[in-house]
């Protein structure tokens, strides 16, 4: 009976993951306004996001800040990113507005954030294909985009790789790993396959980028297979720092 219950829990968890939909909203915040912007988000935004989670409107929320000095200067124009997760595509399609400072605090958003210069760069919607999480608290997260030769076979190899390193995640400081496919927009110049790797500290992030940390024991044959599936490598890899998030 215990084994049956465990199997049922596993299957239900897999169903939730297979339905999860999340949105990336990149933005550029004037560096002179960054400190004030982060203070406002931590003081007002996080609580509204937590209320939205408790009310079942969203599954999770985070604000990320791009780690500077890790790439070309011109690529650092987009320096912040909102992430909002929904438990299913249906929840995303029927989403309701919840970021309302006037309703929550009696202060209109245009007044509260009026002194912050923020320029948004659209919305990018993804479907989670697989993910592993544990009780560690991530401070940094790597976002990886790629154009696979064949998306299904690439995901199959990535599935085998992730299954092989899951047991090493916690001891190597990896709090989360995931794989997702892009739903919208459908532009051909945007990479359709997306991965994330979240760690407790920057040293672990650097180790991961050198194929160490949680992935150091992955079978080299599997890594070679992945390289074959991703002939052009990573289209983009960006390291972000968590500013604020729901639990």
Give the location of each predicted region.
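Bacterial Sec-dependent N-terminal signal peptides
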Residues: 1-21
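Short S/T/G/P-rich N-terminal loop/turn motif that feeds into the first structured element of a domain
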Residues: 18-102, 111-247
